[in-house]
Regions:
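Beta/alpha (TIM)-barrel catalytic core signal, keyed to glycine-rich beta->alpha loops juxtaposed to Asp/Glu
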Residues: 121-310
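N-terminal binding-site loop/beta-alpha segment at the start of enzyme catalytic domains
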Residues: 1-76
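Short, acidic/polar
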Residues: 30-43, 92-108, 155-161
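Conserved, mostly hydrophobic/aromatic
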Residues: 6, 18, 36, 51, ...
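Active-site groove signature of glycoside hydrolases
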Residues: 105-124
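Structural preference for beta-strand elements that scaffold enzyme active sites
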Residues: 13-17, 49-50, 56, 75-79, ...
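Acidic (Asp/Glu)-rich catalytic clusters
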Residues: 8, 65-73, 105-109, 162-166, ...
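Active-site mouth loops of central-metabolism enzymes
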Residues: 22-33, 82-96
């Protein structure tokens, strides 16, 4: 897997990162510890060097900590988060951020994390993020307790505003470098690059819309009918051409986003292998052009997330 610098942090990260939300069980579906360990070990064996987790992801941190025993911790850039602890459980106070870091260190069986981010900032009033949470992160970095700090979230406007206001090392945003939307490339990257901030990309398949079964989840997906209709057209085109739409979506997002890394979350070792293959396989440019011609109705459109109404 190709490595690239994570902005100015001095960290080198793989083009594909492993997302551990599906490994924690609970809200994110069934996954036992043995299955989680197989996925982590497969990722490391394939050359993935960045693993992304969070207290919000059920048992993911604890399972990841056990999976990284035996010297494996030294092989990864470990990223975790604070601020979100459940579907409706948010706390961005300085004390909770600090105690959350300590709990994560204990569960992950490590004495440091490389990347520490606020999780889903759009669910908390922005003044709390600006006045309390980000300063708490910066203090932890100043004390040497974490190497790099940043924020994660969906709304492009919020992410860009925080990048411009604070000395953030990295940001993560999702579903904005897809076959449906290139906001990461056109809006986030220019601001991030101007401020020396690295960008992590996620949700290449647009939270499931760009999969063969994407249509079946439409009722539960936050996207508007316009976005869902564009996704259905992309899925139908790929099916007619005999192409796995999810693999094309991963190819495009990994290879064309311009982000330092693209986080792929899965509970299946085969999907980890497919993501690594997507990073290196040549894209069918003719098919991609046809797919992107279906994008305009959905491009730059967003869905509600937290306090952000889209």
């Amino acid at each position: 897997v190709q490595l690239s610098p994570l902005g100015t942090t001095g960290l080198q990260v793989s083009q594909v990162a492993l997302g551990t939300a599906p490994l924690g069980g609970g809200l994110f579906g069934d996954c036992d510890e043995q299955q989680a360990e197989r996925v982590v070990h497969e990722a490391l064996d394939l050359g993935i060097t960045l693993v992304d987790t969070s207290p919000y992801y059920g048992d993911a941190e604890e399972r990841l900590g056990r999976a990284l025993r035996g010297g494996r911790r030294d092989r990864v850039v470990l990223a975790t988060k604070a601020g979100r602890y459940g579907s409706d459980d948010f706390d961005v106070s300085a004390a909770r951020i600090r105690s959350s870091l300590q709990r994560s260190l204990d569960l992950l069986r490590t004495d440091h994390v490389d990347v520490f981010q606020l999780h889903d900032v759009e669910f908390v009033p922005l003044e709390q993020i600006r006045e309390v949470a980000v300063p708490a992160l910066l203090a932890l970095r100043e004390e040497g307790l974490v190497r790099a700090v940043g924020v994660t979230g969906y709304p492009v406007e919020t992410i860009c505003a925080l990048v411009e206001e604070f000395d953030l090392d990295v940001v993560l945003t999702y579903a904005h470098a897809t076959l449906l939307d290139d906001s990461l490339m056109t809006r986030v990257l220019p601001v991030a690059e101007a401020n020396g901030t690295a960008v992590m990309n996620a949700a290449a398949v647009s939270l499931g819309l760009l999969t063969p079964s994407g249509g079946s989840m439409a009722a539960d997906h936050p996207a508007s009918p316009v976005i869902r209709e564009a996704a259905a057209a992309v899925v139908a085109l790929c099916q007619r051409e005999g192409v796995d739409v999810a693999q094309l979506a991963n190819q495009y997002s990994i290879q064309r986003s311009g982000a330092a890394t693209t986080v792929i979350g899965t509970r299946k070792p085969a999907n980890v292998r497919a993501a690594v293959e997507a990073a290196g396989e040549p894209i069918d440019e003719e098919l991609l052009a046809e797919v992107l011609a279906l994008r305009p109705p959905a491009d730059q459109r967003t869905w509600p997330a937290g306090g952000w109404r889209g």
